[in-house]
Amino acid sequence: MDKNIIIGAMTALITPFKNGKVDEQSYARLIKRQIENGIDAVVPVGTTGESATLTHEEHRTCIEIAVETCKGTKVKVLAGAGSNATHEAVGLAKFAKEHGADGILSVAPYYNKPTQQGLYEHYKAIAQSVDIPVLLYNVPGRTGCEISTDTIIKLFRDCENIYGVKEASGNIDKCVDLLAHEPRMMLISGEDAINYPILSNGGKGVISVTSNLLPDMISALTHFALDENYKEAKKINDELYNINKILFCESNPIPIKTAMYIAGLIESLEFRLPLCPPSKENFAKIEEVMKKYKIKGF
């Protein structure tokens, strides 16, 4: 298997709601907008997609919509398929594979605090259950669980279809250490604030929140960096500084959904509790920053 298969500029899709349900028409339109603006892959039902509060039926529907919308294009679908119960993660991975996803993104098990051996066995079971690429997802700030460098490398070497890791720990030193010990690994940035540092230190892509709003800029940044044109990549990164900062003024995906609503890209500013709309103060701050960016709605 080609372990390079899903890299480049990828978008962690939001999940739009309308009257308490997934707004399927808006979801498909959002994905089409990504396709039209140079994104290499979309990532449905991850953290940004509020996967934790979707029903299993909604989770499956979002994957099906993403696959159907991307059919016949060059854009790949890297489907969220994580759980803190291994059997459930395996089931989600199998569903994604059977319904046409090109690969899966699997978050580290949260809440139950597994050992490194437990993490290894968890991911090995997932990898053995499907024959599509698997990207590990390390985000200890949300899961309370850190996948160690040694465990990531062991999984990469032992499991043919585990091709890399989405790193959202904010730890650049860890990223550099990973590539120093296993340069074949595909390191993917999971934080917009450090996309450029990761790409300029050997990273092979990003899974971006900001690209929901500005897919063309994230695509350009990523591809300039992958082509080793770091001057142009840095220029775009600097232009994105203010929007990247404001899009994390509250818990993701609250600010990005708010920005999408302000831009007219989604019809309703709805969340699933316990997430809720931003404070009036932060809404105004998001609106102010967005005036600097030319963003068109539907």
UniProtKB/Swiss-Prot annotation:
Alphabetic keyword roster: Amino-acid biosynthesis, Cytoplasm, Diaminopimelate biosynthesis, Lyase, Lysine biosynthesis, Schiff base
List of catalytic residues: Y137 (proton donor/acceptor), K166 (schiff-base intermediate with substrate)
Annotated site residue numbers, Part of a proton relay during catalysis: T47, Y111
Molecular function, one GO term: 4-hydroxy-tetrahydrodipicolinate synthase activity
Cellular component GO terms, alphabetical: cytosol
Subcellular location: Cytoplasm
Main subcellular localisation: cytoplasm
Broad EC category: lyase
Pfam families assigned: DHDPS (PF00701)
Homology family: Belongs to the DapA family.
Functional description taken from the UniProt entry: Catalyzes the condensation of (S)-aspartate-beta-semialdehyde [(S)-ASA] and pyruvate to 4-hydroxy-tetrahydrodipicolinate (HTPA).
NCBIfam families to which the protein is assigned, alphabetical: dapA (TIGR00674)
Protein name: 4-hydroxy-tetrahydrodipicolinate synthase
Lineage: Bacteria, Pseudomonadati, Campylobacterota, Epsilonproteobacteria, Campylobacterales
